[in-house]
């Protein structure tokens, strides 16, 4: 989980949930995260489908050089994005909820959480330095 700070807004946080996986349960999990955020009264964008990637490979059936009998396999990785915009404390509580109490999350679905904190503009114009 990475946190980057941007100078705009007033003490708000935008959290992006990047989901990717090979399972057909991925859209269900993305909808469930968005639904839980909307029930909590959090401004939500998504779930947005992102471009999927596919990998294909061919394997010989026999251990010898028989080119007539081969198996072909394909693996598709689907991706979804859900974003929430909320005050810092609410966003932190929702991220903790998603990480701990949102079952069932499949073992084939990976969730990456990216947070962006918007600082008050008064901090930008004061003598404080933001690193």
From Swiss-Prot:
Keywords: Mitochondrion, Ribonucleoprotein, Ribosomal protein. InterPro entries: Ribosomal_uS10, Ribosomal_uS10_dom, Ribosomal_uS10_dom_sf. Gene3D superfamilies: Ribosomal protein S10 domain (3.30.70.600). GO terms for biological process: translation. It is found in: Mitochondrion. The keyword Cell membrane does not apply. Pfam families: Ribosomal_S10. GO terms for molecular function: structural constituent of ribosome. One of its GO terms (cellular component) is mitochondrion. Belongs to the universal ribosomal protein uS10 family. This is Small ribosomal subunit protein uS10m. The gene is mrps10.
């Amino acid at each position: 989980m990475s946190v980057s700070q941007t100078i705009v807004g007033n003490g708000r946080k935008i959290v992006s949930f990047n989901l990717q996986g090979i399972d057909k349960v991925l859209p269900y999990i993305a909808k469930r995260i968005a639904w839980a955020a909307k029930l909590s009264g959090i401004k939500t964008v998504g779930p947005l489908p992102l471009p999927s990637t596919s990998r294909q490979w061919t394997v010989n059936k026999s251990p010898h050089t028989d080119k007539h009998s081969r198996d072909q396999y394909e693996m598709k990785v689907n991706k979804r994005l859900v974003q929430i915009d909320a005050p810092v404390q609410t966003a932190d509580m929702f991220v903790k909820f998603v990480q701990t109490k949102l079952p069932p999350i499949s073992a084939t679905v990976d969730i990456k959480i990216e947070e962006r904190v918007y600082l008050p503009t008064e901090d930008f114009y004061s003598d404080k330095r933001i690193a």
